Amino acid sequence: MKVLTTALLLVTLQCSHALSPTNCDASEPLAEKVLDLINKGRRSGYVFELLRVSDAHLDRAGTATVYYLALDVIESDCWVLSTKAQDDCLPSRWQSEIVIGQCKVIATRYSNESQDLSVNGYNCTTSSVSSALRNTKDSPVLLDFFEDSELYRKQARKALDKYKTDNGDFASFRVERAERVIRARGGERTNYYVEFSMRNCSTQHFPRSPLVFGFCRALLSYSIETSDLETPDSIDINCEVFNIEDHKDTSDMKPHWGHERPLCDKHLCKLSGSRDHHHTHKTDKLGCPPPPEGKDNSDRPRLQEGALPQLPPGYPPHSGANRTHRPSYNHSCNEHPCHGHRPHGHHPHSHHPPGHHSHGHHPHGHHPHSHHSHGHHPPGHHPHGHHPHGHHPHGHHPHGHHPHGHDFLDYGPCDPPSNSQELKGQYHRGYGPPHGHSRKRGPGKGLFPFHHQQIGYVYRLPPLNIGEVLTLPEANFPSFSLPNCNRSLQPEIQPFPQTASRSCPGKFESEFPQISKFFGYTPPK
């Protein structure tokens, strides 16, 4: 018995490796590639850009290296499926939102080649800091940034109805998700800036593949006195259209996520525009123009003080190289290194009806609105518990928003969620099915099936106020091993490190240096 115990202990010690702290600045090139893989695997929200590496550890075994990274990020203005360059994503004089976040990531590399990099899992938390930075007592325009944009699906549908009136080819499209909503109040007007995704629901009413979807920005304008959001005085809307089957992978770095799936990409098709209320109507037919050379937004007009920004007549045309967002999957050990299986049974799901909180209060006080669904998170996959960088910054856990869940490809060509009218607000921002529902699609099964190999989550938390700091994501990833694949040494996935590397955090790179204070620690000078 003692011999057996000793043997088991030796095997355990061989498979377990102490994590080595590493330099955050030196880890930045790899962190950029890891974040690129995360962006390419997402189907909702906005592209993350790296602000800095805030912590970095690694574990080596043979030719494999497992990285444990904490990445401070900022949301760009580019939707995750857009092919535009960052400078071209936002129209001139359009209200933007500053959203910061942190992602805890476990990634594996088998060699120094970028195609051998894979993401094993990640958790992210995000919060808007726009109100804290932009609204002052002297502000001529007050801006409200709503964390629960799904409450404005009606406004998104109204804008899309206007767009479909002027663009008959889009009759079969429906609102997929309200992504951002900003309210601007000043002068005699109140404007709502609503950004949302849409998808084609029929193969019969669109002259392209059914796997077509798009992203729209709509401006709904009201008189300052009105409280009726059902009848805007004017609606301006522009949409981009994408088709994931137009092009295959053109990226130098193929994302590997651990399981075999078709490789898909998408291509931005020509922008169509629609405006009403004494504006010139503009409707462009679908097409795919070549990208312009040397696009520069330096001539973008600045917002005049006291004036509410208006939607421009058209958005900048497509620019930038095609980017692959659909991950490829491969079980084979002959052509590519194997990548880790994500553990099963660890998905946060929506569990409470609208208006009922699963927790008592929010870390930042009340929501902008009074009725939100809240999540029931299992251990290990929610932003609760202890954090590797110290105590919880607020003394509370981040309640409220759940991670993004369902995928555009989880639905058929014309398969809106059953037994609901545009979701009826039941599950906000694509969070998964209630407990007890199958994650696989089938008759009578969950409204929002998770993709069967989703390995990461993004939690949208309430906006931050002056003096508050971002709630960090949970880093207690479940323990799991990489497939053997006849390799002599395989690193065991270790618990996420609980102490920060002495060579961290890295240099804070941002055009918004004032946002560093929302991360709860002072960046190195």
From Swiss-Prot:
Transmembrane segments annotated in the record for this chain: none
Residue ranges with Basic residues bias: 339-404
Residues annotated as glycosylated: N112, N123, N200, N322, N330
Region (Interaction with ATP5F1A): 41-84
GO CC annotation, single: extracellular region
Cofactor requirement: Zn(2+)
Record's compositionally biased regions (Basic and acidic residues): 293-303
Region (Disordered): 273-447
Disulfide bonds: C24-C504, C78-C89, C103-C124, C201-C414, C216-C239
PTM comment text: Proteolytic cleavage produces several HRG fragments which are mostly disulfide-linked and, therefore, not released. Cleavage by plasmin is inhibited in the presence of heparin, zinc ions or in an acidic environment. Cleavage reduces binding of HRG to heparan sulfate, but enhances the ability of HRG to bind and tether plasminogen to the cell surface. On platelet activation, releases a 33 kDa antiangiogenic peptide which encompasses the HRR. Also cleaved in the C-terminal by plasmin. N-glycosylated.
In-chain residues carrying the UniProt-annotated modification Phosphoserine: S438
Residue span of region Necessary for endothelial cell focal adhesions and anti-angiogenic activities: 345-379
One of the GO BP terms on file: platelet activation
Molecular function GO terms recorded: cysteine-type endopeptidase inhibitor activity; heme binding; heparan sulfate proteoglycan binding; heparin binding; immunoglobulin binding; metal ion binding; serine-type endopeptidase inhibitor activity; signaling receptor binding
InterPro entries in the cross-refs: Cystatin_dom, Cystatin_sf, Kininogen_Fetuin_HRG
Leader peptide range in chain numbering: 1-18
The keyword Disulfide bond is assigned to this record: yes
Tissue: Expressed in liver, blood plasma, serum and in platelets. Also present in fibrin clots, wound fluid from acute wounds and chronic leg ulcers.
Knockout mutant characteristics: Null mice are viable and fertile, but have enhanced coagulation resulting in decreased bleeding times. The observed enhanced platelet activation mediates the accelerated angiogenic switch. Also enhanced fibrinolysis. Animals are unprotected against Candida fungal infection. Also shows larger tumor volume in cancerous state, an excessive stimulation of tumor angiogenesis, a suppression of tumor immune respons and an increased tumor growth and metastatic spread.
Subcellular location: Secreted
SMART domains: CY
Cystatin domain location: 19-122, 135-240
Function: Plasma glycoprotein that binds a number of ligands such as heme, heparin, heparan sulfate, thrombospondin, plasminogen, and divalent metal ions. Binds heparin and heparin/glycosaminoglycans in a zinc-dependent manner. Binds heparan sulfate on the surface of liver, lung, kidney and heart endothelial cells. Binds to N-sulfated polysaccharide chains on the surface of liver endothelial cells. Inhibits rosette formation.
Free-text domain note: The His-rich (HRR) region contains approximately 12 tandem internal repeats of the 5-residue G[H/P][H/P]PH consensus sequence. HRR binds heparan sulfate and possesses antiangiogenic, antibacterial and antifungal properties through binding Candida cells, and preferentially lysing the ergosterol-containing liposomes at low pH. The tandem repeats also bind divalent metal ions and heme.
Assembly and oligomerization: Interacts with THBS1 (via the TSP type I repeats); the interaction blocks the antiangiogenic effect of THBS1 with CD36. Interacts with HPSE; the interaction is enhanced at acidic pH, partially inhibits binding of HPSE to cell surface receptors and modulates its enzymatic activity. Interacts (via the HRR domain) with TMP1; the interaction partially mediates the antiangiogenic properties of HRG. Interacts with kappa and lambda light chains of IgG molecules. Interacts with ATP5F1A; the interaction occurs on the surface of T-cells and alters their cell morphology in concert with CONA.
Name of the protein in its database record: Histidine-rich glycoprotein
Organism: Mus musculus
